[in-house]
Amino acid sequence: SEVLKEYGLSGKKEMARQWYDGFSFGDKKNMYNPWSITNYLDKRVFLPYWANTSSNSLVGKLIREGTPDIKMVMEDFLLGKSFCTRLDEQVVFSQLAYKESAVWSLLLAGGYLKIKNYTVEGGKTRCELVLTNEEVRLMFEGMVEEWFSEFTPAYGRFIKALLCDDKKAMNIYMNKVALETFSFFDAGKKPSEEAEPERFYHGFVLGLLVELRGRYAVTSNRESGYGRYDVMLEPLKGTDDAIILEFKVHDPEEESTLED
């Protein structure tokens, strides 16, 4: 706060805290990211300075190719929610591909997550995790945007058709999005046919959360019973219509056509 006062930015104290606070060094809590706060003092504009200093390629790969559960947690993080889990004190890189707790431990150690609360039971620590700050949230949003803009160009056209209520175009572009996304989120582990639709669905929801932020509140039912996945878009402004999307997995053995 003294530094902000010295630069004539006392009125920006709360915003600076939301953007760059949240780090811990040993027993020191609520530490500001020195690189980000220094750049902010110089440029006087709130931007993700630290998050843009590296490609974050490993983090992106872990989330993009991760299980549906990992993507669901990322949905919650982007919505400002928390996630409770046990953590591994020692991060073993060989475990990142199959052990979800190792992924969250790495993100915590890397400064992308912070511990909001924790409990110790039976000698085991369980932590409540949240995104570290606004800078990190924007970094993850930008990461998701790049996934779809670079590898699934039809996605943007689908969103436009959705908002314009163009059902014919929606069907055309959704097929393209599905085909491109299946391969893009493929980790090379040959997931089962049952798992493939869920991998697509949760990647798709992440894209909606980012693409429609500020215009719609996006929620998913998280349940895939009988091959159905639902997404509800609640308008934040009275001029937009509410939208409910239902995805159904086509079973050729039970259905002769999609219309059935």
What annotation goes with each model-predicted range?
Residues 32-260:
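Extended alpha-helical interface modules used as scaffolds for assembling large macromolecular complexes
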